[in-house]
């Protein structure tokens, strides 16, 4: 069983096993836990993978990662995929054109890729907790929150569930469907707080609470341990490796790729956790060419991956039609820095970002990053045009996936004949007003009206009952607080 290592060095905290890192994701010096070693997937192993089901592949990769989870626990966790649209496989790989395949990661209960990790994650945390009381914090730009709440609701984990969840979301920073998915969750172990601020504020608050001695002491006085469900938690990231491997193996199995060809993977990126899974897959030996980060107008990742400079000093967060990517401080870049440059350099960069609002890689370091990554970005006007263009071709996109189509169009010209997979991170129905406007509806439709408009244009589309039901449920969580009052609001709830 491997130990997890720490991105900013060991400090006074020993490296821990995977289970301990899942339950307590707070590493030394404000850093993150990550894998100390990665297995090598030989061509022979990858060929064996081609004949596995998705669940079998997950179990095999976790076994090779040597994470120390029992076969019974993993089987129990992976049963959550049985409730996805197709119980045989939780994802779908759709052909978009001759060179592009769309990996649909949104067929779970909250219609976003976060279900791929967070549905099994809930059962794993519940089991590893061994009946101890835990508080799970989650900050969301719109998709992580609903997926976490769905996973940890008592109806999923049972009435004797010892885990409570507090979800922080930016009051005006999500789609209406995303908000309704959170504020209608009626389970006594769940608390949803809107904050007056943006996702970066929510994520900073979460990280601060993980390190807050007064807050941790208050929880300990009540016998409560503290954890988090964001991709600061390595347990999330582990599951996000699997579908990148699966996509490659399926394309080889179906004869689309020869085993000597590499595959380029495009990922709409905000907090960098999804594309990080692809990075680890490439490090493990999967023949991935470039990992292409697709951003919206908040294009700090584009700037970083093309110049080596991460600079937030003069940036204002812009509200876009792809709100799950409205992020400026991208947490998981830190794990890439560690993997490529080690703990000392990572610690220097993160300290510089905190103290000066920026850090810069030298030319050699930038070259190392660009061995793995490329980048593109897309503004809202381009996004609308691409939604309309794709719809005319017979494929309905959400705005985040549309940013990925822009990346494909940018790079397919340069990489003629190479194959691409685009990770589609959310179903269109979560962002229906923006999709409807792109397809000719008037601006300002409410979500339900916009959904009806889109369905009227495409009779083949069916609305997921998971989305339909949020419009009928009563709102349970009304509280909105200033950032400075989040800690007190949580403590009051737990009293």
Say what each PLM segment does.
Residues 1-495:
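PLP-dependent amino-acid enzyme catalytic core
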């Amino acid at each position: 069983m491997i130990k997890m290592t720490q991105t900013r060095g060991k400090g006074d905290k020993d490296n821990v096993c995977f289970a301990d890192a899942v339950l307590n994701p707070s590493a030394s010096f404000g850093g993150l836990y990550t894998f100390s070693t990665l297995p090598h997937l030989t061509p022979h192993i990858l060929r064996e993978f081609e004949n596995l089901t998705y669940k079998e592949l997950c179990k095999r990769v976790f076994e090779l990662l040597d994470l120390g989870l029992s076969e019974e626990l993993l089987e129990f966790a992976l049963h959550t995929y049985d409730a996805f649209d197709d119980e045989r496989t939780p994802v779908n790989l759709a052909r978009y054109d001759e060179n592009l395949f769309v990996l649909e990661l949104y067929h779970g209960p909250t219609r976003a890729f976060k279900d791929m990790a967070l549905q099994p994650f809930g059962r794993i945390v519940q089991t590893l907790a061994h009946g101890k009381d835990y508080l799970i914090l989650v900050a969301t730009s719109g998709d992580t929150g609903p997926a976490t709440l769905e996973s940890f609701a008592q109806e999923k984990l049972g009435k004797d569930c010892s885990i409570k969840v507090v979800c922080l979301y930016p009051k005006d920073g999500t789609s209406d469907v995303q908000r309704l998915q959170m504020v209608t969750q009626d389970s006594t172990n769940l608390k949803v707080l809107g904050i007056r601020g943006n996702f970066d504020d929510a994520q900073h608050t979460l990280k601060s609470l993980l390190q807050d001695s007064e807050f941790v002491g208050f929880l300990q006085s009540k016998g409560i341990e503290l954890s988090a469900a964001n991709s600061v938690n390595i347990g999330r990231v582990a599951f996000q490796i699997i579908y990148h491997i699966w996509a490659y193996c399926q394309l080889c199995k179906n004869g689309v790729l020869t085993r000597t060809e590499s595959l380029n993977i495009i990922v709409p990126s905000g907090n960098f956790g999804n594309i990080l899974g692809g990075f680890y897959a490439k490090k493990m030996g999967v023949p991935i060419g470039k990992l292409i980060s697709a951003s919206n107008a908040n294009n700090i990742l584009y700037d970083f991956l093309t110049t080596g400079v991460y600079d937030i000093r003069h940036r204002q967060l812009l509200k876009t039609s792809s709100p799950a990517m409205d992020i400026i401080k991208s947490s998981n870049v830190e794990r890439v820095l560690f993997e490529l440059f080690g703990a000392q350099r990572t610690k220097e960069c993160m300290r510089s970002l905190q103290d000066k609002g920026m850090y810069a890689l030298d030319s050699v370091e930038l070259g190392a990053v660009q061995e793995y990554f490329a980048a593109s970005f897309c503004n809202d006007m381009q996004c609308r045009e691409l939604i309309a263009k794709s719809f005319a071709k017979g494929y309905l996109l959400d705005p985040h996936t549309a940013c990925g189509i822009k990346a494909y169009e940018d790079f397919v010209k340069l990489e003629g004949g190479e194959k691409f997979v685009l990770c589609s991170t959310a179903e269109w129905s979560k962002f229906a007003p923006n999709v409807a406007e792109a397809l000719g509806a008037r601006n300002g439709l409410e979500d339900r009206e916009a959904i009806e408009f889109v369905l009227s244009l495409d009779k083949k589309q069916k609305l997921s009952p998971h989305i339909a039901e949020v419009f009928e449920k009563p709102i349970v969580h009304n509280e909105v607080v200033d950032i400075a009052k989040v800690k007190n609001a949580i403590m009051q709830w737990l009293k």
